[in-house]
């Protein structure tokens, strides 16, 4: 019960990194919210021809810092976003990772959130990736489960390459649609700044949204292609030829999990947007 769409993304979604210190503690950590017993799709624990090489089921009492670090800062992140990312708006509870977007005036921003990353800790190339998550919702809410090239710090974006396993934007019934996209630099790593984008989407037609229950967002990544799946149903494929443009996708990448608030693509929260908003991640494998 899905419809398929292939599209070319025209928005630029990279950022200027702000490493500034927070002036005071924002709202963060476990705020007492009881994690609902969400239903939804669960992926197999194994696949023929694959070996599990890394996972995080978020069963520890705290976020595992051997796997995850934090991006800290505001300044719009290149997309005119409205949140300030802290290390206090995410925590583990009941075997889940919870990332919370909060409405509050903080360091010149109107919202706080968290952006977790495995940069410098865990990097990956090729294989199957499954992420089981229940998404937030509302106008101006922009959750993402994505990857950047390991060499991002050296070559910057888009030369590092980017793989968006899942993006969703909230409001106007857009919570029914998942977007999967790749970003790279036209002309390869030695060319001038020339972003290129190609992605696909899948829209649920069963009356439910991606915020109603858990879904599994997946890619199967080889030297020849990247294939995107929602609940193990393929909805997009990108062939990887041997051109210099696509060379980044034959190197290691790291994960980023975040909720952005506002920005050029989703627009901004309005009176209909309810805060806090939470993304609940059951596992990544």
Language model feature labels by segment:
Residues 3-285:
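GH16 jelly-roll
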């Amino acid at each position: 019960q899905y419809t398929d769409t292939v599209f070319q993304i025209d928005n630029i979604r990279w950022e200027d990194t702000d490493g500034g210190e927070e002036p005071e503690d924002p709202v963060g950590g476990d705020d007492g919210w009881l994690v609902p017993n969400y239903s939804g799709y669960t992926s197999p624990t194994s696949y023929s021809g694959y070996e599990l090489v890394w996972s995080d089921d978020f069963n520890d009492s705290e976020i595992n810092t051997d796997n995850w670090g934090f991006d800290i800062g505001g300044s719009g992140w290149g997309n005119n976003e409205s949140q300030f990312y802290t290390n206090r708006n995410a925590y583990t509870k009941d075997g889940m990772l919870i990332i919370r977007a909060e409405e509050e005036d903080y360091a010149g921003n109107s919202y706080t959130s968290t952006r977790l990353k495995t940069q410098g800790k865990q990097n990956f190339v090729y294989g199957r990736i499954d992420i089981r998550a229940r998404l937030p919702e509302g106008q101006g809410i922009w959750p993402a489960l994505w990857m950047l090239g390991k060499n991002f710090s050296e070559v910057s974006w888009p030369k590092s390459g980017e793989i968006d396993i899942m993006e969703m934007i909230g409001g106007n019934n857009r919570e029914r649609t998942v977007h999967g996209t790749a970003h790279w630099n036209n002309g390869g790593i030695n060319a001038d700044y020339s972003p290129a984008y190609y992605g696909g989407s899948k829209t649920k037609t069963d009356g439910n949204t991606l915020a109603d229950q858990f879904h599994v967002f997946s890619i199967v990544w080889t030297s020849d292609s990247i294939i995107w799946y929602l609940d193990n149903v393929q909805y997009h494929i990108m062939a990887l030829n041997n051109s210099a443009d696509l060379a980044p996708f034959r190197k290691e990448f790291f994960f980023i999990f975040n909720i952005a608030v506002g920005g050029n693509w989703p627009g901004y929260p309005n009176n209909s947007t309810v805060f806090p908003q939470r993304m609940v991640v059951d596992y990544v494998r």
